[in-house]
Amino acid sequence: MRIPPLEDGGPGLGLCSEADVVRLVETFYLRVRRDDLLGPFFEARVRDWAAHHSLLIAFWSSLLRGTRRFHGAPVSCHLGMPGLTEAMFLRWLALFRQTTAECGNEAMRREADDAALRMANHFWQRYQVKRICIGEPTPLPAG
């Protein structure tokens, strides 16, 4: 997958309020849930949206504000999901960037978009490797 890069650099942590993070998460996931491609995928997997939002708010608050409230392994818990596609990752990123572009905080937009790009690339690469490795491994030839 080739995701268009963003500009280098970033403003660092502590650049937004907790209310900004809450608004980002709630607005973004409302878009995700309404999206024709992503909505059905997420709706089939997320049972408790309030709990999921709380977790995501802690995650993004840790990244954007340095709160260190999030404790978890986001990539590992998503790797087992069947059916993810490159188009889904690209759509997720496009919706995220649309949301951050409307947040009114340029420093937050840059930091959040950079983090989302890194995560999307890392997650997609790990997901592909896991998909290739499912099943019996091919042994190396003897000798």
PLM regions: where:
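Core of compact, soluble alpha-helical bundle domains
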Residues: 1-143
